[in-house]
Amino acid sequence: MATFLCLPSLWAQGNQYLMAEAPQKLVAKRGTSVEAKIAVSIEPNFHVNSNTPSDAYLIPLKLTWTAGGALEPGEVVFPKARMEKYEFSDKPLSVYSGDFDLVAKFKVPAGAPQGPGIMVGKLRYQACNNNSCFPPKTAEVRLSYSVQ
């Protein structure tokens, strides 16, 4: 299984509580599977609900990819969340804070066209501080790739 070539990429745009950084370029071979590590950074004193929030009314962290391009999106692997108690909730919540990584998996079909491309992802999240939660936001993640 191929992995990613790391370092700078495009950060999520806008006045956000979260930034997401994809590898600089993913190199993929036809007929294989590849993984891209997406580095996520949450502003200090904030957290986001995990991909499996504690209550149904909370909005989960979710990464989706726009259809198109040579790569076929697969599973997204999330880190283990922490259970934290906050003033605005009667029970602990499943959250992420600080810096962590998501791993996005892709299949590269045997007939995929060779050459460069860009996958566009949307990372939806609900940010909270110690007192309250805010309306959900979406950060764009752009993943450059090259099929060989």
Please give the residue ranges for each predicted region.
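Extracellular/lumen-exposed scaffold segments
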Residues: 11-148
